[in-house]
Amino acid sequence: MSAFSVEKIGLQDSQQFSKLFIDYLAQQEHIQPLYTFYPDMAGLETAIEKRSKQPINRTVLVERLKAQYKDLPVSEKVQQNIERLASEHTFTITTGHQLCLGTGPLYLILKTLSCVKLCEALKTKHADNEFVPVFWMASEDHDAAEINHFYVFGKKYTWETTQTGAVGRFTTTGISEVLETIKDIPAWLKDAYQSSVTLAEATRKVMHQLFAEYGVVVIDGDDAALKKEFTAVIEKELFEQPAVAVMNQTNRSIERHGYSIQVNPRDINLFYVKDSLRERIEKQGERFVVLHTDVSFSAGEIKKEVADHPERFSPNVVLRPLYESTILPDIAYVGGPGEIAYWLQLKEVFAVYNTFLPAIFPRMFSGVITKQQCVKLEKAHVTVAELFLSEFDLKQVVVSRSIQEEISIEAEAGKITAAFDTIASIAATVDGSLQSWAQAEKAKALKQLEDIEKKLRKAEERKHDDVIKSVLGIRDKILPNGKLQERQESVFTFLVNDAQLIEKLYQSLDPCTFNIQMCCYE
């Protein structure tokens, strides 16, 4: 099996990323106070040293992972990695995502492979340690509209459901009917949803099918025993509310440097979860109120509720990273630009809760270009990098390379300029007022020449319209709606025609190269 040929596009050149993200990777001085470890191998090695001094409850972690996997035929690599987590010499590199139908966009695959490859790279340098890639299921999120669809070959497939609350607890009713409408979708994907009661159960099966051979461990944080490890943070957030003040201070600093804020904290950064309910908790007077319900607690009552039912308290986006770092021996979190933006807001929140802040590592960025598309680009003499140009500039590139001789009136314009300058000089000797007239006539002549050039170019564009349409069509596949392909298309767009796609991506991509790595079939 041959891997892809890879063409690298600079992140800044692509015009797809925020200034904060670019400046973070460039190690700009004013960004450095927002993180502890820079995302490179040296930073990860320092994180290993620091993380080893902040232990977690590994016994509970291993027990709960085994329980979560009990109904699944676990691969040998995954089983080994779960067992390895019992050792203090084992560390995790984690990514997470919502429980999107059909895994959602391709970048979920890239995030997960980033974890796998970083773990393998560290193992070659630290033979005495073990490194486990972990996928965190965001099963407690409650935004159904963000997870109920995916795209295959540019078409959106949507699962309509009226269920509410934590999405991991949703039943899978109706998903099979959606998948039946998709041609050539793998049978195992349909079976994963058909054989599962909940969306969390189905998502674990899907991720296990895709990544079991790489040893990826899937964890569900919606777990009472794991939440019990987080109760100290839950109680402190309820009664002292320290996160909001320190995070707002960080946010003001970020805004002073001209960046946008990704996340704003609440006074209490917790939801109350029960059955199909997930609503924010707010302190109103002396009581803790669950918004949009008639549920409320006194201080004593909510303290008892935390002790008896920690699973009913769900961290929001501010505290979820702390929850992950509390129950996992993380040395790094792998995320996209948006995730990294809000992780950079959290350093002081981690500090106020005395929780380890892992390295914040960017995921790999990529896209897939078919063999047919590569051939068409080659015939048009267009590079992959040039697909990231504006539509106007890309058209100019196609036209200029499709014609035998460049259309340019530069030489003729020079001749006209010289001729009129001579005329102007002669006119000045006859009558000074005629000189400005001659210069005005020169401007008119040059403008007419420019109009002629535009008409010639338009005629040339029409002549090469088929080539232009072909190239722009490829561009629309690589950058649908102007965004990276990985942000829309599902992995199943490509798995349908190439069952080895994930292995090829694994073989071809480098997690420490901060570029867009476009993968071309050879």
Curated annotation (Swiss-Prot):
* Keyword Ligase included in the entry's annotation: yes
Among Pfam families, the record links this protein to: CC_BshC, Rossmann-like_BshC
What's the name of its gene? bshC
Example GO molecular function term? Answer: ligase activity
Protein family according to the UniProt entry: Belongs to the BshC family.
What EC numbers are recorded for this enzyme?
Answer: 6.-.-.-
Tell me if Transmembrane helix is a UniProt keyword of this record: no
Residue runs in coiled coils: 436-469
**Organism from which the protein derives:** Cytophaga hutchinsonii (strain ATCC 33406 / DSM 1761 / CIP 103989 / NBRC 15051 / NCIMB 9469 / D465)
Q: Which residues cross the membrane?
A: none
Q: What is this protein called?
A: Putative cysteine ligase BshC
User: Which UniProt keywords are given for this protein, alphabetically ordered?
Assistant: Coiled coil, Ligase
What InterPro entries would the database entry show? Bacillithiol_biosynth_BshC (IPR011199), CC_BshC (IPR055399), Rossmann-like_BshC (IPR055398)
